[in-house]
């Protein structure tokens, strides 16, 4: 007994000594809240280390040493334990491990990296949507948002791989994951364009937008992408104005029909998934298991990317050499026509161009209520041409849009059209809601135009420019810095210099000559002013009849 007592006392003493040693190492170190949150919120998304919560999970199950010794082998072994329980946290740890190791193996064509990134989407998707797992999801837990980001960014990485490997999902394709395969079939969801084999899908995460005051991004599920779409011959028919390619914002979502521990996987079959592509201007949420989830979307980066792909036309050239813009003039749609959205048409001013509006457009599209109700168009025109002539081009472009896009006049939204004009563009916009009668022509001649002998083309040009009525489908006009009563600068040295630089197309420059030879030239200063070289700057004079 005494021997046992001595052994017990010795063991107790050793235990107290060990515990005392540990106690001396436990304590606190003063820090700042910034440092505390930076350390506790760190994860594989913003560093080259696992999150503290993932490391804590590995330590609790005595797995840290195995992980540090051989990360990839550990990941293979650890993933095999997935279906041993209904542990939700294990799925998030696996997703983060796959994402981190995928980054370490990353190259655009790495099969291993692609397998890891796709596996990360499988585990993150299960963490977010499998309602049988424990514990229940807590939307206040930052790991909930981390799971969304791991899913989104892993999917974006996989999109890059798919592009580089030229994999097409028009027919189902089997792609490997850590254990088994995923059979993916592509499905377009309410897209305004026809997907082509030549389309490029570029993750928005790989670009930083510049030149815009604000960056608009809505958080949710899915990988925001920039789609560079090559137009087909069929799509070009009926378009107003287009380039050889269009740039769109889109969101890719990979919808898993099976859980990695579900019946499909247990039987050794591939998990089934659909690769869905959405237009965020048409769809802002998706339904998953009878619940609605917002789509992640980025509208600013595709806008900036579009501008970087195209050489902006010079506003100065558009003023002094009107013929240089002759083929470019007309209406441009930012996205294909949507019959349920009100068209907003931006009309730029003197020596300007449509790209002037991109900053404002970025802010308008960043407002959910506005982008749900409106679609945005641009009118481009050579700004050196006479104001009445440019207004006739705008009028004809709007009438053509009505004929092509809503020939039966059934779209109620089209009848609510809004024009937004800056500077001289405001004058063009104002003319769309005015009735000229014969007031402008009467300044030139007391005789009706039909009684005078003009070449047919010149006669039609004069009719279009000087005789007009309000467009019935234009409901509102917004004026920004518009010189409704003319501008003093038009008669100053700057105006005279501008007029001297403008070179009108021959068909316009010849009209004043024909008029002077045809009409009586004894109707006063107003007539004399209109018979001068009819440039836009002369049209802005305060004494001009316009």
Residues covered by each model-derived region:
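Short, surface-exposed alpha-helical segments at coil->helix boundaries
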Residues: 354, 358-362, 388, 392
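Bacterial N-terminal signal peptides that target proteins for export
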Residues: 1-9
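A Trp-anchored, charged/polar loop motif used as the substrate-binding/catalytic surface
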Residues: 76, 323-331, 354, 397-407, ...
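Alpha/beta-hydrolase fold catalytic core
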Residues: 311-330, 335-336, 510-546
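Serine-dependent carboxylesterase/thioesterase catalytic core
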Residues: 99-175, 344-350, 376-530
């Amino acid at each position: 007994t005494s021997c046992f007592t001595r052994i017990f006392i010795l063991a107790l003493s050793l235990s107290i000594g060990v515990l005392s040693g540990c106690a001396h190492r436990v304590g606190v170190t003063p820090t700042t809240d910034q440092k505390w949150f930076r350390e506790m919120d760190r994860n594989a998304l913003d560093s080259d280390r696992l999150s503290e919560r993932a490391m804590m999970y590995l330590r609790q199950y005595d797995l840290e040493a195995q992980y540090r010794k051989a990360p990839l082998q550990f990941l293979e072994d650890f993933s095999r334990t997935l279906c041993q329980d209904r542990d939700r946290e294990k799925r998030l740890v696996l997703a983060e491990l796959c994402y981190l190791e995928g980054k370490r193996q990353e190259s655009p064509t790495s099969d291993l990296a692609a397998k890891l990134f796709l596996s990360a989407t499988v585990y993150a998707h299960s963490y977010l949507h499998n309602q049988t797992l424990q514990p229940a999801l807590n939307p206040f837990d930052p790991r909930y948002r981390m799971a969304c980001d791991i899913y989104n960014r892993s999917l974006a990485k996989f999109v890059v791989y798919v592009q580089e490997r030229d994999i097409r999902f028009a027919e189902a394709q089997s792609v490997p994951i850590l254990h088994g395969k995923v059979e993916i079939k592509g499905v377009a969801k309410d897209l305004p364009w026809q997907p082509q084999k030549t389309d490029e899908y570029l993750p928005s995460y790989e670009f930083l937008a510049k030149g815009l005051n604000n960056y608009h991004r809505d958080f949710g599920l899915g990988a925001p992408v920039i789609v560079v779409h090559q137009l087909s011959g069929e799509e070009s028919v009926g378009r107003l104005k287009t380039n050889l390619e269009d740039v769109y914002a889109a969101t890719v979502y990979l919808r898993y029909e099976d859980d990695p521990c579900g019946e499909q996987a247990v039987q050794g079959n591939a998990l089934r998934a659909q690769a869905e592509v959405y237009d965020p201007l048409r769809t802002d949420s998706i339904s998953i298991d009878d619940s609605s989830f917002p789509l992640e979307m980025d509208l600013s980066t595709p806008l900036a990317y579009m501008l970087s792909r195209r050489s902006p036309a010079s506003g100065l050239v558009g003023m002094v050499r009107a013929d240089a813009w002759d083929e470019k003039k007309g209406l441009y749609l930012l996205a294909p026509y949507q019959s349920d959205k009100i068209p907003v048409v931006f009309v730029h001013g003197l020596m300007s161009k449509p790209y002037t509006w991109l900053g404002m457009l970025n802010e308008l599209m960043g407002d959910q209520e506005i982008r749900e109700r409106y679609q945005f168009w641009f009118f481009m025109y050579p700004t050196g041409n006479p104001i009445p002539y440019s207004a006739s081009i705008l009028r004809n472009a709007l009438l053509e849009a009505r004929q092509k896009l809503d020939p039966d006049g059934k779209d109620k939204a089209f009848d609510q059209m809004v024009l937004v004009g800056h500077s001289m563009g405001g004058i063009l916009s104002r003319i769309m809601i005015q009735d000229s009668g014969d007031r402008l022509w009467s300044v030139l001649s007391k005789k009706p135009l039909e009684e005078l002998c003009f070449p047919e083309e010149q006669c039609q040009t004069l009719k279009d420019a000087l005789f007009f009525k309000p467009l019935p489908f234009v409901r509102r006009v917004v004026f920004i810095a518009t010189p409704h009563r003319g501008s003093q600068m038009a008669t100053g040295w700057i105006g005279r210099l501008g007029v001297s630089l403008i070179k009108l197309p021959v068909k316009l420059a010849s009209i004043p000559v024909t008029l002077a030879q045809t009409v009586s030239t004894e109707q006063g200063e107003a007539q004399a002013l209109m018979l001068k070289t009819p440039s836009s700057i002369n049209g802005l004079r305060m004494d001009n009849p316009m």
